[in-house]
Structure formats: C-alpha cells, structure tokens
C-alpha cells in the first residue's frame, strides 16, 4: 500500500492529478485503496484503475506527463520502453539489495529486533527488506539467539496463527523463495 500511496502524496503536493494502478496480485488491498480514494478525491483529480495485462497495455498506449512505477525489472523495461515513445519522464522503483551489517560494536538485541521486523514486514516483499546479513563470526551465535527471540516477540509460538505474520503474495513468490533457500541450504544457519 505504501508503494502506491507514497508517490501519490508527492503528486498531490505538486498539484498534479494522478491515476493509480494497484497490483492485481493484491486484490483486497486494491479494492480497499480504490474505495478510500473514491471517498476522498473527485475522480478527475485522483482515480484508481484495476486490472492485469490488458489494462497495462491500454495504459502504456496513453500519453502521460510522468510515470512512477514500482515492480519487477522485467515490467520496468516494458514501462520504460512505452514511456520512451512519448519521452515521458519515468521513475522506476525496482528494488535492490539491502544488506545488514552487524559488527562487534553493535547492540545485538536492537539489531536483531530491527532486522526481524524489516524482514518479516510484508513477508519480506518490500524493496528495502533485508536480503542478507554480514556479521562478525564471533557474534553469530548471540545474534541467532537474539533473532529467534525477536521473531518470537513479533509472532509468538506459532507464526502461522499470528495476525501480524503475513504470507507471500502468490505461488510464484513462494517458488522463488523456496529456490533460494534450497540453493543455499548448506550455508544457511536457520533460526
């Protein structure tokens, strides 16, 4: 939701109109946002359109003053190519790598809490979610214990029952995560 609404704040602040196109992978969130936007704004200023590839194709064929896109690099290339036809300025939020570094001077409990929160927020499906941890070998065991405590505080004894523990958005996201885990299972230290 934040990836859709944060750019809207900038557009409104600049006096621009906006058309929001939420992800089809989160239909309940999209419907909620559409309802809120329609209650708050006249649709000539801010509107929401929903759909999948067909809607994207229609939108890509239109002339825009600017495009702010959040999503995959593959779709980002399509957005950029479509925008180039009209020399439309584009901001692409395509994610990246977000390492965490824990050195010997770090407060282990604080680091573990923050990393656990950042990685489990939205099932780690944000572009700023921690991807990997670089930690001094002497801190590995202390950190692992602190991280386990932090996860327990966030999600309780059974994460599956926690109202704060979210799930991966679809089977494809699960398959990608599973593939990464399997590829690195000999070097992973699982909590």
Sequence positions of predicted segments:
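Rossmann-like NAD(P) dinucleotide-binding subdomain of oxidoreductase/dehydrogenase enzymes
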Residues: 1-110
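General alpha-helical segment detector with a strong preference for membrane-spanning helices
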Residues: 19, 100, 140, 188-189
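ALDH superfamily catalytic-core signature
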Residues: 41, 74-182
